[in-house]
Amino acid sequence: IAPATANVCAKLAHGLADDMLTTTLLACQCPRIIAPAMNTRMYENPITQDNLRLLEHYGFTIIEPASGLLACGDSGKGKFPDEGLILEYILRAIAYPKDLAGKKILVTAGPTQEAVDPVRYLTNHSTGKMGYALARMAMLRGADVTLVTGETSLTPPPFVNTVHIKSAHDLFEAVTSRSEEQDIIIKAAAVADYRPAVVSDEKVKKSDGDLSLALERTEDTLSYLGAHKRPGQLLCGFAMETEHMVEHAKE
């Protein structure tokens, strides 16, 4: 039901069926999703909140309203949620088999940033789209998903525990501290193999001569996970290649 008024929520919470909508909802046994939208003070009213909690108790899924300018001219929580978010709720409820229910899946995505100084860093062209798509599909199929992501322009999928990282070291710590409890780990991030050996505390000034940076290896997260993989755990790694892709993939 989108939008669901305070009146409709109250009727449904107490089993009233005096029109087609409430009568249908009282009789149906399919997944039921409600998107409350109303004035902020109506939404925050303890009676409305009690009704929403009661609906959740009876198996309704409640989509939290957004915050912003309301139809009445006020500004606050109670705004109709983004249609894309509502669609994700619907897809999650009815569109995909829940063959991954009960599974914990960790996905990495996006690039890493290796600082040169407070202003500059080394990175790559990864968009994160592959990892985000994998995390979203795992979520839609019922998995408990953790997404460890570098800086991207993408919005993390809903219902996913998102962990933001910057460097390869950050990613190593974020992944290895969570790896033991995961059933599946998918490494789709584009992780730097090297980082500056020394990070300047101040911006490196330009000069007439060339600039050389000493680089050192970063932690190999995938190798660590492979060496510490527990029985039954599935580990999947991605590698970006520009030539001999099949041969390198087999390696």
Question: What is the meaning of each model-derived region?
Answer:
Residues 3-9, 38-40, 68, 110-114, ...:
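Short glycine-rich anion-binding loops that position phosphate/pyrophosphate groups of nucleotides
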Residues 28-29, 139-145, 159, 220-233:
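A structural motif corresponding to the C-terminal end of an alpha-helix
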Residues 12-39, 54, 63, 208-224:
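Short, acidic/small-residue loops that bind anionic groups at enzyme active sites
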Residues 87-103:
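Flexible nucleotide-interacting loop at or near the entrance of a catalytic core
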Residues 20, 29-67, 75-90, 231-250:
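Short, glycine-/small-residue-rich phosphate/pyrophosphate-handling segment
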Residues 49, 53-54, 99-167:
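Glycine-rich phosphate/diphosphate-binding loop of Rossmann-like nucleotide-binding domains
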Residues 151, 159-223, 227:
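A glycine- and small/hydrophobic-rich beta-loop-beta segment
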Residues 6-17, 42-45, 116-123, 194-206, ...:
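Glycine/threonine-rich flexible loop motifs
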